[in-house]
């Protein structure tokens, strides 16, 4: 059984579950994967609580322990910034936790040439803590939007998705995407799990899967989860 620690935010956790189901293509109810979604929406905000490391760790760990007690074979966390706490969570949890940034990196190796520019759209917390740099700096050059675009467009789009204002979020994120394309990025990581919802708003699942520009961590993590579930 797959354990999903969600609630960061709720829309992002549901987006992951939706992609997990669509990837599976079960012909009957019984053909779909068993999973537990713990929508733990009371976890303190990650980007604004980086300095309260232990407080956030405790809440995340409680979520992982809940899933472990419910007999989950492994755990996934559809939140990029939460992976700042990944190492301590894995040390204190008795089942594997799949690392989202690592899976995105392993996917990128297959899609991009060494030293390629890869754009990263993410929370300021994800950028500051380097959860993607930890992997990508080995083979790629990560590129970010300038500060004004980060503040006016990326942060705004993330907030709008959390508020359920998807059309507004889709409009807000466009200048950030265009700026990274102008910087000749080969791919763009949607490094906050709210952002695929904004980018792919109202698009079919087939178009999401075939995107040549964007790397969707939720979709990549869902693929990795299905492989591990079936192994």
Specify the residue positions occupied by each region the protein language model found.
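Non-catalytic structural scaffold of enzyme domains
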Residues: 1-231
